[in-house]
Amino acid sequence: MYCIAILTDQEQEGQDSAEYIRNYCTEKHVFPLIEIYQNQEQFFAQTLKVVPTVVFLALPGVSGLNAAEHLRSLYPKCGIIWCSDLDFSLHAFRLRIEYFFMKPVEEQKIKEGLSIWFECKKVR
């Protein structure tokens, strides 16, 4: 089973993102476990037990950059879809992030990121 983690600092954004991800996955007949985290410490503690297949990272500014760097260093094979309020596209490229976009969080952008990840991994 796939596990998709959402790490955000805004509760409503996390709920909306989970709904967008759920809709996309249902269309693809994939039914992952979706977990939402608003606390980086809790998120990274949980990854020691279960490494998510994909992480949707939506944290502002440098905290998002730090989380992306930390996540990539710990789990280089984990898929990352990263949304930021700042243009960290060059950092995302350097970190081999599967998909980067700038806020606002929109369903179409999340779907594009998931499509790229699914295509790279040939998930069926």
Question: What are the residue ranges of the model-derived segments?
Answer:
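A general structural signal marking secondary-structure boundaries and capping sites
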Residues: 25, 47, 121-124
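Conserved acidic carboxylate
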Residues: 8
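Two-component/phosphorelay signaling modules centered on CheY-like receiver
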Residues: 11-35
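Non-catalytic signal-transmission and effector/linker regions of two-component phosphorelay proteins
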Residues: 1-5, 15-18, 124
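Acidic, metal-coordinating helix/loop segments flanking the phosphotransfer/catalytic sites
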Residues: 36-53
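CheY-like receiver
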Residues: 53-123
